[in-house]
A protein has these predicted regions:
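Glycine-rich phosphate/dinucleotide-binding loop and adjoining beta-alpha-beta core of small-molecule
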Residues: 27, 93-220
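Short, low-complexity, charge-dense intrinsically disordered segments
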Residues: 1-25
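Positively charged, low-complexity intrinsically disordered leader regions
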Residues: 29-54
Length: 220
């Protein structure tokens, strides 16, 4: 579905688009069925336009993690490296430096709350690092903290570049969904339940229903 400048993809589907190969996809509802299975690229023009080496590829900043988990950021970092990103940086809360720093030696660190999540004082560092990047991924594992929630909201609207929001980051966005859906250059990758809640919170004109099928929901 698309609301103003924001694109929203259901989590299982986005991987078909990213991989662009070995596509097996079936979308069904009462009056529509589409089946495509092929070993050819879904969007060959995207593959042909990709840089031939990392020097011509973009720079990605990954933000996420808390004192109990950095899996989302670590997984995103590994996937970006495999996908051929030109340069990748990861920022974690500084509370995890001693615990997880050795697992991500490339990581940068920003100020955290006493409980180990990103604090509001991390905002300046995150915005500074975002100036370096061509795109930012809010990878998730932010934990549950009101100070982190405030920081995320401020970052989303102070940073005006390409932004991808996924995993538990989506849930932080419910409180400012009305503003989020008019933010340009924004991609949200979430579960159906998350996207449904986001659409409701943003006062979307049409509700998303699981039983309606993918095609009708995308049309909404």
């Amino acid at each position: 579905a698309e609301f103003a400048g924001i694109s929203i993809f259901l989590f299982p589907i986005v991987f078909y688009v990213i991989r662009c190969v070995n596509l097996t996809q079936q979308i069904c509802n009462n009056d529509y069925m589409w089946l495509k299975q092929t070993d050819k690229p879904l969007y060959p023009e995207i593959l042909w336009s990709r840089p031939e080496n990392r020097n011509g590829a973009g720079r990605l900043l990954i933000i996420g993690g808390n004192t109990h988990a950095i899996a989302a950021s670590a997984t995103a970092f590994a996937a970006a490296e495999v996908a051929g990103a030109g340069a990748v940086r990861v920022i974690l809360p500084d509370h995890v430096r001693k615990t997880f720093g050795k697992f991500l030696p490339e990581a940068f660190f920003a100020p955290s709350t006493p409980s180990g999540s990103f604090g509001t004082s991390a905002l300046a560092e995150l915005l500074s690092q975002a100036d370096w990047a061509d795109a930012v991924l809010l990878a998730g594992d932010f934990g549950r903290n009101s100070e982190t929630a405030s920081m995320i909201e401020k970052f989303v609207f102070k940073y005006d570049g390409l932004l991808c929001i996924t995993q538990d980051t989506v849930e932080y966005c419910y409180n400012f969904a009305v503003k989020l859906v008019v933010r340009p250059n924004t991609l949200i990758v979430g579960s159906f339940a998350q996207i449904q809640r986001l659409a409701t919170s943003s006062k979307a004109p049409k509700s998303l229903q699981f039983n309606d099928g993918l095609v009708r929901n995308v049309g909404a």
